[in-house]
UniProtKB/Swiss-Prot annotation:
Superkingdom, taxonomy of origin: Bacteria
Identification of the protein by name: Polyisoprenyl-teichoic acid--peptidoglycan teichoic acid transferase TagU
Gene: tagU
Family as reported in the entry's similarity comment: Belongs to the LytR/CpsA/Psr (LCP) family.
TM ranges: 5-25
Chain ranges on the Cytoplasmic side, renumbered to this chain: 1-4
Length: 304
């Protein structure tokens, strides 16, 4: 769902500042404040003195964990969705891997195995990053976290979105007919969370998440939504976190955006069933996981 959110944010920035004059200055000032607010470094990003350590060089391949946090009220919740993307600006290509939330794996820092989405509940984004790195055997350079409960604010801020729905269903009091439908923030949240009535299960849910995000990107980057740019920035500020700095965001917008033109989506094969404890898990064969690891490491140009 979220693989383009960074480029969407920066695309809006680029459109809004071309007006020039005082308006452009005010917009840039608001954007700068928003990017400062969403910047949340990982614990490992700081040295013993609390100073952020250097990141990778410009124009080198990078990996990003896109994490949808299922936070409701005071409940920290679990990661509602996990997606890893790798970007290689040398050949302008991108690979994306959506990790099923029920995937059974070692939870780094807990000394046990569990569903991969439980890592967020146990140790927040730091433990999620470490667990995904262990699971895929690839380094994660950056993360972008979106509060899924507050994602509806972003949808409403751009005036709702239009998507093409391929499965008629009802969820959380909202009915979704087949065909083109317009979604408010609340409807978009229900639309992207449903999976039990979908024969494709979590994979169908992931597809709807991508649909909504792509619609948000298209709507948010259009001139018709500029009048509400303040609402958009407020929604981002409240619901997005990342360890990317402002400079890194602008560098990424400049050097990595063309990677979107050549995208490959990699699915994780496996088998879902109940374990002896009666809990449903998604099991990924070692050979299948190694194949994905090899693809990602090659794309990141990692030789060791």
């Amino acid at each position: 769902m979220k693989k383009k959110i960074l480029f969407w944010i920066l695309g809006i920035i680029g459109i809004m500042i071309i007006g020039g004059g005082v308006y452009a200055y005010n917009v840039y000032s608001s954007v700068s404040k928003t990017l400062d607010e969403v910047h949340k470094p990982l614990k490992r990003d700081k040295d013993s003195n609390g100073v952020e350590t250097a990141k990778i060089s410009k124009s080198e391949p990078v990996s990003i964990l896109l994490l949808g946090a299922d936070e409701r009220g005071e409940d920290k919740g679990r990661s509602d969705s996990l997606m890893v993307i790798t970007l290689n600006p040398k050949n302008n290509s991108m690979k994306t891997v959506s990790i099923p939330r029920d995937t059974y794996t070692e939870i780094v820092g807990k000394g046990k195995s569990d569903k991969i989405n439980h890592a967020y509940a146990f140790g927040g984004v730091d433990m999620s990053v470490a667990t995904v790195e262990k699971f895929l055997s690839v380094p994660i350079n950056y993360y972008i976290e979106v509060n899924m409960e507050g994602f509806k604010d972003i949808v409403d801020a751009v005036g709702g979105v239009d998507v093409n729905n391929d499965l008629e269903f009802t969820a959380n009091g909202h009915h979704f007919a087949k065909g083109n439908v317009h979604l408010t923030g609340d409807q978009a949240l229900a639309f992207t969370r449903m999976r039990k009535e979908d024969p494709r299960g979590d994979f169908g849910r992931q597809m709807r998440q991508r649909q909504v995000m792509q619609a948000v990107i298209k709507k948010g980057a259009s001139f018709s939504s500029l009048s509400s740019y303040g609402d958009v920035l407020t929604a981002i500020q409240k619901n997005v976190k990342t360890n990317l700095t402002q400079d890194q965001m602008f560098d990424m917008q400049k050097n990595y955006k063309n990677c979107l033109q050549n995208s490959e989506e990699i699915q994780i094969p496996g088998d879902g069933h109940k374990a002896a404890d009666g809990i449903w898990y998604y099991y990924v064969p070692d050979a299948a996981k190694q194949d994905i690891t090899n693809k990602l490491r090659a794309h990141l140009e990692l030789t060791k």
